[in-house]
Amino acid sequence: MDNNEISSHQPVLLREAIQALAIRRDGLYIDGTFGRGGHAQAILAALSSEGRLLGVDKDPAAIAAGHALAQKDGRFTIVQASIGDLARVVSERGWLKRINGVLFDLGVSSPQLESAERGFSFLRDGPLDMRMNPTVGQSAAEWLANAKEKEIAEVLRVYGEERYCRRIARAIIQARELNSLTRTKQLAEVVAKAIPRWERRMHPATRSFQAIRIFINHELEELRAALEQALAALAVKGRLAVISFHSLEDRIVKRFFREKARGEELPPDLPVMQKDFQQASLKVLGKPIWPVPEEIAHNPRARSARLRVAEKQTY
């Protein structure tokens, strides 16, 4: 792990995320998507010697960066786990209902995209992997080698909102009959040929790579689980801040915040009064926050980012 990688990575909506967390100097915080530690270092800077920060990530490279930070700052600990396993991580530390803030910065990180060996980018030729943790589960190449045409099309439609999902799926099946699809450039070329030229407002492989990555890593399922578990782990008045990068993620976060802010209606025949049945609820704090033009100019990856923030109201 290059120690410069932590400082060179540009965290998105950094100032806005730190403000949103309203950090208590002696508080307990979780960075649920540690990455290369950009947000984590800013949180630590706002904490006193009594404050604590737990970083969570399943990427081995992120864990290595986290260990480097932990050696320099005893207030920080890193754990290799998925955000969907947050409940276990919190319970093991006795932090349940004590956490003052949780931050999720969703999606793939810049270092992951920039590393050809990770297989996330259609702009760099590398193994067709796409796993956040390359030691767990099947790679994109392994899945594409065995998936049926209908399944591939459905993944592209649901997770990539790709209108040409059937054409692309058919092209993938035809291509793999000739040669195994094991490289990112191979897949990108197959997808590009399946999409009409007049539809190429962005790179033709963008949606397909997003869809396959989300599917391979179970990203949306883990996000739904993580939101519920984060709410349960927060102390009253604790903050939940989520940075998303595409509509699928943001839709889930928006719906979760709205449902928890509204509360759930109890069945009329339940033998308890509604007022006596406390449920964990959220107060949505303002509208989504977008990057300012200056940040987008400095870091183009930030252009699609949005930050939603909510505060826990009751146990």
From Swiss-Prot:
A GO MF term: rRNA (cytosine-N4-)-methyltransferase activity
Binding of S-adenosyl-L-methionine occurs at: G37, G38, H39, D57, D105, Q112
**Superkingdom of the organism of origin:** Bacteria
InterPro entries documented for this protein: RsmH, SAM-dep_MeTrfase_MraW_recog, SAM-dependent_MTases_sf
- Subcellular location field: Cytoplasm
GO annotation terms (biological process): rRNA base methylation
Q: Which reaction is this enzyme known to catalyze?
A: cytidine(1402) in 16S rRNA + S-adenosyl-L-methionine = N(4)-methylcytidine(1402) in 16S rRNA + S-adenosyl-L-homocysteine + H(+)
Q: Which UniProt keywords apply?
A: Cytoplasm, Methyltransferase, rRNA processing, S-adenosyl-L-methionine, Transferase
Q: Gene Ontology cellular component?
A: cytoplasm
- Pfam families assigned to the protein according to its UniProt record, in alphabetical order: Methyltransf_5
**Which PANTHER family does the record associate with it?**
12S RRNA N4-METHYLCYTIDINE METHYLTRANSFERASE, S-ADENOSYL-METHYLTRANSFERASE MRAW
Family statement: Belongs to the methyltransferase superfamily. RsmH family.
Q: What is this protein called?
A: Ribosomal RNA small subunit methyltransferase H
Gene name, per UniProt, is rsmH
